[in-house]
């Protein structure tokens, strides 16, 4: 099975922010770095044929053309005014669908429908609810995927964390899989750091683990500064950087180190 492309810029997915943030207090949003006047001046003009301009998906600074009715997802352009990016009715894994660009721009629920909801009814919405929208992902918690290449690792991280949160603390201490252990520690530390007043995390490292709990050979830092973070190559069994490899912005071509050893 081919290696899943590693993340270049991925903060924390919504379920992680909710679950880990709750452990240390109210979850704090992760914000993109501010756009400087210099960066905004470099933005190309929106095409004249664009009926509506909107903020970009991700931590970029340049406006894009909003999507009409049709396909959408976490890393696509935002839906036009009055539309909301939602998983299709009956989708068993709505968050998965949105990260794969398999949602749809639909008319947003009317205010009247929202007001007629029984206030006494229990709240049943969860991070995997069918009501999960692109707006909740990108606005409420500032969860930004800067390109379609980030999405496989996003879903990979969701799968890893879903298995983690079902375990007791004593089970976690018994883990032998190095990447899975490190990922849990990193997420726990990030959740605590986000509680500190005035702190703004614009770069950090989120381990890229495979389904067996070891490392993918390509690892990248998360960047919320509108450009890809650095990527490097590691040994899958230890996560240690491969001797002779260099950190680059983009694909470090990790396969070359393993091919040379054959």
Swiss-Prot record:
Signal peptide limits: 1-25
Chain location of the short sequence motif Cell attachment site per the record: 249-251
GO cellular component annotations of the record: extracellular space
Region (Disordered): 101-133
Protein's GO biological process: regulation of insulin-like growth factor receptor signaling pathway
Domain (Thyroglobulin type-1) ranges: 176-254
PANTHER family attached to this UniProt entry: INSULIN-LIKE GROWTH FACTOR BINDING PROTEIN, INSULIN-LIKE GROWTH FACTOR-BINDING PROTEIN 1
UniProt subunit comment: Binds equally well IGF1 and IGF2. Interacts with integrin ITGA5:ITGB1. Interacts with VHL; this interaction inhibits HIF1A degradation.
Protein's name in the database: Insulin-like growth factor-binding protein 1
Species this protein is from: Sus scrofa (Pig)
Gene name linked to the record: IGFBP1
């Amino acid at each position: 099975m081919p290696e899943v492309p590693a993340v270049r810029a991925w903060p924390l997915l919504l379920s992680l922010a909710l679950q880990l943030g709750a452990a240390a207090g109210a979850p704090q949003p992760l914000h993109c770095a501010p756009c400087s006047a210099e960066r905004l001046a470099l933005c190309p003009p929106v095409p004249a044929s664009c009926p509506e301009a909107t903020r970009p998906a991700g931590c970029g600074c340049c406006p894009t053309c909003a999507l009409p009715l049709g396909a959408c997802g976490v890393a696509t352009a935002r839906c036009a005014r009055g539309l909301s990016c939602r998983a299709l009715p009956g989708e068993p894994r709505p968050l998965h669908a949105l990260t794969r660009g398999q949602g749809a721009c639909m008319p947003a629920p009317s205010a009247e429908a929202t007001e007629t909801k029984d206030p006494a009814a229990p709240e049943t919405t969860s991070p995997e609810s069918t009501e999960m929208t692109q707006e909740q992902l990108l606005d409420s918690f500032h969860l930004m995927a800067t390109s379609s290449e980030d999405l496989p690792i996003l879903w990979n991280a969701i799968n890893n964390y879903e298995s983690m949160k079902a375990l007791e603390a004593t089970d976690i201490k018994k883990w032998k899989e190095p990447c899975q252990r490190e990922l849990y520690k990193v997420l726990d530390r990030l959740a605590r750091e986000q509680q500190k007043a005035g702190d703004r995390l614009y770069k950090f490292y989120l381990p890229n683990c495979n389904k067996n709990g070891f490392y993918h050979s390509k690892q990248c830092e998360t960047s919320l500064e509108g450009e890809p973070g650095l990527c490097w190559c590691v040994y899958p069994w230890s996560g240690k950087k491969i001797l002779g490899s260099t950190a680059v912005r983009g694909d470090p071509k990790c396969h070359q180190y393993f091919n040379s050893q054959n």
